[in-house]
Amino acid sequence: KEGDEILVPANTFIASIIAITDNGLTPVLIEANKDSLQIDENEIEKAISFKTKAIMLVHLYGQSSFTEKIIKLSNKFNLKIIEDNAQAHGCKFEGKITGSIGDAAAHSFYPGKNLGALGDAGAITTSDYELATTIRTLANYGSRIKYVSEYTGYNSRLDEIQAAILDVKLKYLDIELEKRKKIADLYLKIITN
């Protein structure tokens, strides 16, 4: 409800903040861990208040933000975990793929991403059937039945061309990620200052 708080890393992209504020919620910025550049698990608990409802984990730089401590805190305080998986397609935490671990996840398929479409594209994933139904309805003008709108919705459907491109590219994601890792390792080896 309006005024509820979502914990979010301070070093995130503005889109993560807008997703919170556009829904009448309050972002509470949490500093990043200086080593991982992910949300600092040691700063989370002191930021939790009676208004805190969720932690938004923004998986940055191809790394998972998940830690055992964050999962324990979410359970202890009954907080939802929302994943921003825009920069971490194919990333794993304890054998599970990011974007499939939290309560819901946002995925960007902007052309510059690891898994990019030809134009703007995105998706939301969740294992919560009721939430998935609401999201699908909102994305289709608020309608489950043609010309009957339950909500004020959006035109936010993934078009067939973008879906076809992503379907092909997804088959090669692991290979492409491995190539990126090799290039990054080469940079780290060559650039010494």
Each language-model region and where it sits:
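Radical SAM/AdoMet-radical enzyme domain recognition
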Residues: 73-78, 96-104
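PLP-dependent aminotransferase-like
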Residues: 1-85, 92
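Active-site region of PLP-dependent enzymes
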Residues: 88-94, 101-193
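Residues at secondary-structure transition points
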Residues: 11, 35, 39, 96, ...
